[in-house]
């Protein structure tokens, strides 16, 4: 389900207008707080997670605010019509739905009921 959600997002960005694609990245407005929580939570709770593994999220603590500021400015300057503004809101809703689907898939695979799909990461398994 996570792969499907990511592919749906890539297709969305490919097929929509530039302003819609940029608008879908506005979830980055909230990323630093979320990444900070993820970093500490994952390091505390998962022995297979190391500081090195978390480098992507650590970089996002400073990169995400710049990316979000750029995206917000771009959307404000380019979504001038009511139709374009509605499309921007739809793009952001789509992206949040993609993120929820990913979270639901991870919950289903690794928590309850714990059905890890074939080919996925298995904690403590041959790949983990």
For each predicted feature, which ranges?
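Non-heme di-metal
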Residues: 1-128
């Amino acid at each position: 389900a996570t792969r499907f959600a990511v592919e749906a997002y890539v297709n969305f960005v490919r097929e929509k207008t530039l302003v819609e694609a940029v608008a879908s990245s506005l979830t980055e407005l909230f990323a630093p707080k979320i990444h900070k929580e993820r970093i500490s939570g994952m390091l505390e709770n998962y022995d297979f997670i190391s500081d090195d593994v978390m480098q992507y999220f650590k970089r996002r603590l400073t990169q995400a605010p710049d990316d979000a500021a750029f995206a917000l400015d771009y959307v404000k300057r380019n979504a001038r019509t009511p139709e374009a503004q509605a499309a921007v809101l739809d793009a952001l809703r789509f992206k949040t739905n993609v993120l929820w689907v990913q979270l639901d898939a991870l919950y289903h695979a690794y928590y309850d009921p714990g059905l890890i799909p074939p080919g996925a990461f298995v904690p403590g398994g041959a790949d983990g």
